[in-house]
């Protein structure tokens, strides 16, 4: 049995971002994920599951060391945002120029973010990726958890 300080169940974008954020902290981190992500083919058609990454998220992904990898694949700037509720009169819109920014963020396929974080975690000696794997049980001890 392997001993770790932090076990993250779920190697999606959030779980991998947490793991990569803990890199260099001195903690031994394990990430359990049901499947290994498929490599991204450059000629693959764009996927429909995307995230609107704002400037704060860009800074986080830069700090995690994956933003340049993401930009080198597929990312598209967005300059405006409009949000409304179809069942009410609620509506908001804003753009980069009115806020004094060059852009508001980027639209990025979730698989691109996920794969960049997975690759970063794979390169870390502090992070163990366990995939395919599923959590079977958690046992609480007096001084540790199994």
PLM regions: where:
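Conserved N-terminal helical subregion
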Residues: 76-146
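N-terminal Rossmann-like FAD-binding beta1-loop-alpha1 element of flavoenzymes
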Residues: 2-31
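Glycine-rich FAD pyrophosphate-binding loop
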Residues: 23-48
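Short glycine-rich hinge loops at helix-strand junctions in the catalytic core
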Residues: 26, 65, 126
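N-terminal FAD cofactor-binding segment of flavoenzymes
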Residues: 45-86
């Amino acid at each position: 049995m392997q001993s770790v300080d932090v076990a993250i169940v779920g190697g999606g974008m959030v779980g991998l971002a947490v793991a990569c954020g803990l890199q260099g902290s001195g903690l031994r981190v394990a990430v359990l994920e049901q499947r290994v992500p498929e490599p991204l083919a450059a000629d693959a058609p764009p996927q429909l599951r995307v995230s609107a990454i704002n400037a704060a998220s860009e800074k986080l992904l830069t700090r995690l060391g994956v933003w340049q990898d993401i930009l080198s694949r597929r990312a598209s700037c967005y300059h405006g945002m409009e949000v409304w509720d179809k069942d009410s009169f609620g509506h908001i819109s804003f753009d980069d120029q009115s806020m004094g920014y060059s852009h508001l963020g980027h639209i990025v396929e979730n698989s691109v973010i996920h794969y960049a974080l997975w690759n970063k975690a794979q390169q870390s000696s502090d992070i163990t990726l366990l995939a395919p794997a599923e959590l079977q049980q958690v046992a609480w001890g007096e001084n540790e958890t199994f």
